[in-house]
């Protein structure tokens, strides 16, 4: 009984203090059971619940209107100002006499035309994307060829090892697994493991642009740790080198001994030299032909020189 009496006394004292703190205007607001209109109802609710997530036009520091502009406030009940939200629009553009939608991003446009572009070093994320594209294009059509454009330095860049040689082997195996023929084209550099992918394309459809560069080399690896671990890694990198020599020999048509001798140091090829060596089948020029290319021929046609 004494505990209950003490609790009741404390509650009465706390209630009296709270009533003294609350302004009379707030107490009068609570005493009004009805509101004149729906707008006054919304204003009263906004005044009664001062949450940082509540929108409105009141001037309290806790109001959501202080946190963002009223035009961006989704909970703004004011009828005098228009609401503003996020709207996604597709604006057509004119092409001739027809209205068309804007083109997609370039990567999607290339993929739509069955072009897979390798424009980075061979790292796991790049390998994963290329494998997914090959498999999907096979699912889409098993007859149409897939075009692989290569501009890559392999698994290294500026002498720094970025990926594993097995990344190239994974792409190589999928190239042989999918049913559509894969036409390869070097559009810049095809160095190291990227040169292996270039020469692994369909026979007769391995090509390069006139200013591209092709290079073959043996795999690179750096080891550290215990002597036993280094020895295991050394055997593995030798196995990778042997496998790479076999694959080059298979697609180029030269003996493994000659391939291994040429790979002791990095060996660079121009497109014409790559054709003679057997890495590619042809050099792709523009429509005007190799004998009619450049500024000089254009000036001659214009009778300026």
Curated annotation (Swiss-Prot):
GO BP, sorted A to Z: proteolysis; regulation of gene expression; response to reactive oxygen species
UniProt keyword terms in alphabetical order: Chloroplast, Plastid, Transit peptide
Organelle transit peptide: 1-68
Location(s) in or outside the cell: Plastid, Chloroplast
GO cellular component: chloroplast; chloroplast envelope; chloroplast stroma; cytosol; plastid; plastid stroma
Gene3D superfamilies: 2-enoyl-CoA Hydratase, Chain A, domain 1
Principal localisation: plastid
Disruption phenotype: Embryo lethal. Delayed embryogenesis and albino embryos, with seedling development blocked in the cotyledon stage. Under heterotrophic growth conditions, seedlings develop into small albino to virescent seedlings.
A Pfam entry, by short name: CLP_protease
One MF annotation (Gene Ontology) recorded for this entry: serine-type endopeptidase activity
Family note: Belongs to the peptidase S14 family.
Function noted in UniProt: Involved in plastid protein homeostasis.
Subunit-level organization: Component of the chloroplastic Clp protease core complex which consist of at least 16 proteins: CLPP4 (3 copies), CLPP5 (3 copies), CLPR4 (2 copies), ClpP1 (1 copy), CLPP6 (1 copy), CLPR2 (1 copy), CLPT1 (1 copy), CLPT2 (1 copy) and 3 copies of CLPP3 and/or CLPR1 and/or CLPR3. The core complex is organized in two heptameric rings, one containing CLPP3,4,5,6 in a 1:2:3:1 ratio and the other CLPP1 and CLPR1,2,3,4 in a 3:1:1:1:1 ratio.
Name the UniProt record assigns to this protein: ATP-dependent Clp protease proteolytic subunit-related protein 4, chloroplastic
């Amino acid at each position: 009984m004494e505990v209950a009496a003490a609790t009741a006394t404390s509650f009465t004292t706390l209630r009296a203090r709270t009533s003294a703190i609350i302004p009379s205007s707030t107490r009068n607001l609570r005493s009004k059971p009805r509101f004149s209109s729906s707008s006054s109802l919304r204003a009263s609710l906004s005044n009664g619940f001062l949450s940082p997530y509540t929108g409105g036009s009141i001037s309290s520091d806790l109001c959501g209107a202080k946190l963002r502009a009223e035009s961006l406030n989704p909970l703004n009940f004011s009828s005098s100002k228009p609401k503003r939200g996020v709207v996604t629009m597709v604006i057509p553009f004119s092409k001739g006499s027809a209205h068309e939608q804007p083109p997609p991003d370039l990567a999607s446009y290339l993929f739509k035309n069955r072009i897979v572009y390798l424009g980075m070093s061979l790292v796991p994320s790049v390998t994963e994307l290329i494998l997914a594209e090959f498999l999907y294009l096979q699912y889409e059509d098993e007859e149409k060829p897939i075009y692989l454009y290569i501009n890559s330095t392999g698994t290294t860049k500026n002498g720094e090892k970025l990926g594993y040689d097995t990344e190239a082997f994974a792409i190589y195996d999928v190239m042989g697994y999918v049913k559509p023929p894969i036409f390869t084209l070097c559009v810049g550099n095809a160095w190291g493991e990227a040169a292996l992918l270039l020469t692994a394309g369909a026979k007769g459809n391995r090509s390069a642009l006139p200013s591209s560069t092709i290079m073959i080399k043996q795999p690179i690896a750096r080891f550290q740790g215990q002597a036993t671990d280094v020895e295991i890694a050394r055997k593995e990198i030798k196995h990778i080198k042997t496998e790479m020599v076999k694959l080059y020999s298979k697609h180029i048509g030269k003996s493994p001994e000659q391939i291994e001798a040429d790979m002791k140091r990095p060996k660079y090829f121009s497109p014409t030299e790559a054709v003679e060596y057997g890495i590619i089948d042809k050099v792709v020029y523009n429509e005007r032909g190799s004998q009619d290319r450049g500024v000089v021929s254009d000036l001659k046609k214009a009778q300026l020189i």
